[in-house]
């Protein structure tokens, strides 16, 4: 058994103990160790080694998916990281860092799709692989379909229908990314049904990523998603944003194989809780008028600005789902885990960097602060007002102003 000897014991079955672990499966890399650009919009400090350390020392994340590992620069960093002895690959897939964190090697690929009304659309796909040799092979093959394989989230000259075969060739799985956002997603600008994209291969997809502007209650108004596991991930472009959304899983160990079983709900492995932002905090929750420069009020779906009559809008996720849903009311399958609205520490009014650092120095990880500590524990370190804010955020008692048009929503103090 690797890396989880301190995890909470749940029950014994299949001759194996089961554990609750936290997973964030969508974290970007900003720069390589040699300062080569990977994700242009991501922080320079966001490199492979720093992500592993952040997850272990500050966030309390047990499984992290780093989705820029197909870049040759990152592959070189991984090889050098393994040589330090701080991390090692395991047979069941994944890289274990200091016996605490399992790193899943991934790649975000933008595919070219026949979009809505015949126009050319594009969507992001999260591709995960068990071993370094698998992603090295994937990287080499994808370099024939992508102009610059060294950069993150580059557009390939193939469709997702074709991509999934290449992913499987290298023992990987494909998960559609932030499925509802207006840019670079399947439901947002390519289709009203994933089955139209993947056709007979649709059953090969174990899960979809909800994205920051949606949640289980919105997604479960679409019938074809009843068979898919929902994952909530951070899409982090900086170290502090890791685990702004995450999943609690029940697994027998931390590895690629155990993660895959959890996504497929096999052998008792499963996601037991999705922790996500209230979708109103997302950047694209409501429709935004590009002329007026503000969200458009009114009942969804909003497709025209009711102030200036402009159609120059960025469609909101909530509005888009209202258009494509095929259920009048949300109805989730019995296997669907609980969705818990989560406000990260960085979103809570009054919590600056110094206060967050003080909390982490005293209590270890963000998971401890968000889930486990009592008000008295918090108050002893940061005072009554800040402790009340953290508890209010935990209990969903804060007011939220909806985001849209690429601008995050805002949390208002009670």
Model feature map: region roles:
Residues 22-32, 69, 232-237:
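Histidine-centered catalytic micro-motifs
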Residues 270-337:
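Cys/His-rich short segments
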Residues 29-45:
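Acidic/histidine-rich helix-loop elements
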Residues 53-74, 173-176, 207:
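Divalent metal-dependent hydrolysis catalytic cores, especially in the metallo-beta-lactamase
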Residues 296, 341-347, 357, 376-414:
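C-terminal extensions
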Residues 228-244:
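Short acidic/histidine-rich active-site segments
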């Amino acid at each position: 058994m690797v890396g989880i000897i301190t995890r909470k014991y749940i029950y014994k079955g299949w001759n194996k103990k089961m554990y609750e672990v936290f997973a964030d499966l969508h974290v970007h890399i900003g720069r390589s160790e040699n300062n080569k650009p990977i994700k242009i919009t991501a922080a320079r400090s966001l490199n492979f080694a720093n992500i592993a350390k952040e997850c272990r020392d500050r966030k309390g994340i047990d499984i992290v998916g780093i989705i820029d590992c197909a870049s040759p620069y990152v592959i070189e960093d991984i090889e050098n990281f393994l040589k330090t002895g701080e991390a090692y690959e395991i047979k069941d897939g994944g890289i274990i860092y200091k016996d605490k964190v399992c790193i899943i090697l991934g790649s975000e690929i933008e595919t070219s799709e026949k979009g809505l009304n015949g126009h050319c659309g594009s969507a992001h796909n999260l591709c995960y692989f068990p071993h370094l040799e698998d992603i090295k092979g994937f990287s080499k093959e994808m370099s024939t379909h992508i102009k610059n394989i060294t950069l993150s989230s580059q557009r390939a000259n193939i469709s997702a229908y074709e991509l999934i075969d290449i992913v499987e060739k290298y023992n990987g799985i494909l998960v559609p990314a932030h499925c509802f956002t207006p840019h670079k997603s399947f439901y947002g600008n390519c289709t009203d049904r994933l089955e139209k994209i993947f056709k007979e291969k649709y059953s090969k997809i174990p899960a979809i990523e909800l994205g920051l502007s949606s949640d289980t209650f919105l997604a479960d108004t679409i019938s074809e998603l009843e068979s898919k596991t929902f994952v909530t991930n951070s899409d982090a472009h900086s170290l502090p944003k890791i685990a702004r959304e995450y999943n609690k899983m029940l697994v027998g160990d931390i590895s690629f194989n155990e993660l895959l079983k959890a996504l497929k709900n096999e052998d008792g492995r499963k996601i037991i809780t999705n922790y996500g932002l209230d979708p109103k905090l997302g950047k694209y929750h409501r429709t935004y008028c590009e002329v007026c420069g503000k969200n458009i009020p009114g009942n969804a779906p909003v497709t025209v600005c009711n102030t200036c009559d402009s159609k120059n809008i960025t469609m909101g996720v909530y509005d888009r789902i209202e258009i494509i849903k095929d259920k009048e009311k949300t109805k989730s399958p019995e296997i669907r885990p609980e969705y818990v609205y989560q406000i990260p520490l960085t979103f809570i009014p009054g919590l600056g960097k110094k206060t967050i650092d003080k909390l982490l120095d005293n209590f270890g990880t963000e998971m401890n602060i968000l889930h486990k500590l009592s008000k008295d524990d918090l108050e002893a370190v940061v005072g009554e007002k800040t402790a009340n804010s953290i508890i209010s955020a935990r209990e969903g008692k804060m007011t939220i102003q909806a985001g849209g048009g690429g601008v995050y929503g805002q949390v208002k103090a009670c």
